[in-house]
Amino acid sequence: MTERFQSRLADVIRRPLITEKATRALELNQYTFEVDHRAAKPDIKAAIEQLFDVKVTGISTMNPPRRSRRMGRFAGKRAQVKKAVVRLAEGNSIQLFPES
């Protein structure tokens, strides 16, 4: 685990990504999260295991390119994001949608 996130693992995970593809992956016990773009795989694994009390068996990460945005005549870039697909051990799950 890198020193950057050692004391604050909750800052690694930004939010779960709920898309059509990510929802299909839930059946395979794979969860998709948006994470800090500086986070390494050991940071992500430690954060998921500590926050959700589950066993992680694998992580795939991707850094999609930044997209350009325009506001009138001003051009800019969106913030850098990193996606992580986390595979959990059999029998483990994360409750993304609270039951009422």
UniProtKB/Swiss-Prot annotation:
Species in which this protein is naturally found: Synechococcus sp. (strain CC9902)
Record-linked PROSITE patterns: RIBOSOMAL_L23
Record's keyword annotation contains rRNA-binding: yes
Function of the molecule: One of the early assembly proteins it binds 23S rRNA. One of the proteins that surrounds the polypeptide exit tunnel on the outside of the ribosome. Forms the main docking site for trigger factor binding to the ribosome.
Name this polypeptide is given: Large ribosomal subunit protein uL23
UniProt-listed Pfam families: Ribosomal_L23
Keywords: Ribonucleoprotein, Ribosomal protein, RNA-binding, rRNA-binding
Keyword Ribonucleoprotein included in the entry's annotation: yes
Assembly and interaction partners: Part of the 50S ribosomal subunit. Contacts protein L29, and trigger factor when it is bound to the ribosome.
MF (Gene Ontology): rRNA binding; structural constituent of ribosome
InterPro entries, alphabetized: Nucleotide-bd_a/b_plait_sf, Ribosomal_uL23-like, Ribosomal_uL23/eL15/eS24_sf, Ribosomal_uL23_CS
GO cellular component, one term: ribosome
GO annotation, biological process: translation
Family statement drawn from the similarity comment of this UniProt entry: Belongs to the universal ribosomal protein uL23 family.
